[in-house]
Regions:
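Terminal, low-structured helical/coil segments at or just beyond the last alpha-helical repeat
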Residues: 416-437
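Alpha-solenoid repeat junctions
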Residues: 44-48, 74, 78, 105, ...
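Alpha-helical, heptad-rich or low-complexity scaffold/stalk segments
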Residues: 30-96, 103-107, 330, 427, ...
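Amphipathic alpha-helical scaffolding segments comprising HEAT/armadillo-like alpha-solenoid repeats
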Residues: 18-28, 48-60, 79-91, 111-130, ...
């Protein structure tokens, strides 16, 4: 039995519900078509990028198994030439198609992402899709990587109106990884979904994009009943420096259900840099909770009140908890101690770049401190005899906060005999050039 022309035209006009069979397959028997087309796509995939134009039409096939085989083939091939086809696949109404297309798009701009994305955890029962999201969500492309507008548009639309909550949450994660600023309205709308996973992924994406204009749209979640969502909202409020939310953060501190929420609220308040909160920071600097001591020190660091220097000096010398001591070192340096002696706070921060457990904390503090030209001048001499981890860590810091005076030092790292240092230096110099006018 062959397909009639009216049926073929109808399939084209309604491809969102029933994508059309590629013309070259239209005259084959219906029962045999599916298996033959699946095999055909698999055979094409082995030809690499040259097969992309031939595979793409199968994304509009009437049979889902064929469309899935096509998007899998595109994911496996990878590379910029698959982008247009994957954007088309992301518009499919099936959630698995949306998820596979999303991960494939991210993989183009962050090679290797398919191994860490949720695609490998997918399970399907009929139209129901289940996926396992990892708790680690710190990936983000380098700032010099350019992502075409249609990619961000389709991912934003999926985060707002995907076929399943899993595909929406996955798209929100992808928007964050790709720094999709244009999709912020979609992420803010996703915050109203009442689904904890989707709300959390949307908040983390907003954090990565770092657009302060999004701050007010997050404030309503500062008292959310789900602790994970509430903490993400608190962190986002601090990162985006939403000053209008300061009263809400103070209430959260007073009424926090857990110590973890209180710590995050004090930390977020510390990012807002309001002198009215100095008393709060001084109080928590001596708290028995090391996380609260750390947040108190960070708040005083950003206020830069000279009267707090002796208090922070004393706290730094007495502190034994690594996390809190790093925050106190940050505070002492912020208030003007730029010495680079063996036991000085600034040297302590640089030394901590060698610690796998606390490297990220040290990079964050040094990034903030290095916006001050005097701090940069203090650390430049260290780079000549630094360890590999110190060189790569400071390379990241200078990429984010350096200025023209940082170029010669990054140039030196680009020429470093250590391949790892050279690679990080090359990326960092490119990031710096992208940032600077």
């Amino acid at each position: 039995m062959t397909r009639s022309t009216p049926l073929f035209l109808s399939a084209i006009l309604t491809f969102a519900q029933a994508p059309a069979v590629p013309p070259q397959q239209a005259q084959q028997p219906a029962q045999g078509d599916t298996k033959q087309r699946v095999r055909a796509v698999r055979d094409m995939a082995g030809k690499g990028q040259d097969a992309i134009p031939t595979i793409a039409p199968y994304l509009r096939d009437i049979d889902l198994s064929v469309r899935l085989e096509a998007v899998k083939a595109l994911d496996d091939i990878g590379g910029p030439k698959t982008v247009d086809a994957l954007v088309e696949a992301a518009r499919d109404n099936d959630p698995e198609m949306q998820i596979r297309a999303t991960d494939g798009l991210v993989n183009v701009y962050m090679p290797g992402y398919l191994k860490t994305g949720i695609t490998g955890t997918l399970s399907r029962a009929g139209n129901s899709i289940r996926a396992k999201f990892s708790d680690t969500n710190d990936q983000v492309i380098d700032s010099y990587v350019e992502v075409p507008a249609p990619v961000i548009q389709v991912l934003g639309r999926l985060s707002r109106a995907g076929a399943s909550l899993e595909s929406r949450a996955n798209a929100a994660r992808a928007v964050g990884i790709l720094r999709g600023r244009a999709a912020i309205p979609d992420l803010l709308e996703a915050l109203n979904s009442k689904d904890n996973r989707l709300m959390y992924e949307s908040l983390v994406a907003i954090q990565k994009i770092r657009d302060p204009a999004a701050g007010p749209g997050v404030a309503f979640l500062l008292r959310d009943l789900d602790e994970k969502v509430q903490i993400a909202a608190i962190q986002t409020t601090g990162m985006l420096r939403n000053m209008s939310a300061a009263p809400d953060l103070r209430q959260v501190i007073d009424r926090a259900r857990t110590a973890k929420v209180r710590r995050e609220a004090v930390s977020a308040l510390a990012m807002l840099n309001d002198p009215a909160d100095r008393g709060i920071f001084l109080r928590y600097l001596n708290d028995k909770d090391d996380g609260l001591r750390a947040s108190g020190a960070e708040g005083l660091a950003r206020l830069k009140n000279p009267e707090d220097r002796p208090v922070l000096d004393k706290a730094f010398e007495a502190e034994r908890n690594t996390n809190a001591r790093l925050s106190m070192a940050f505070g002492v340096v912020s208030l003007g101690n730029l010495q680079m002696s063996e036991f000085s706070p600034l040297q302590y921060l640089v030394n901590t770049l060698n610690s796998k457990a606390y490297r990220g904390v040290a990079i964050a503090f040094l990034t903030e401190l290095a916006r001050d030209p005097a701090v940069r001048q203090a650390v430049y001499p260290v780079l000549t005899h630094a360890t590999r981890d110190e060189k790569t860590g400071m390379s990241i810091v200078l990429a984010r906060s350096g200025e023209r005076d940082s170029e010669p030092y990054l140039d030196a790292l680009v020429k470093d005999p250590d391949p790892e240092v050279m690679q990080e230096g090359t990326k960092s110099l490119r990031t710096l050039h992208t940032r600077l006018p």
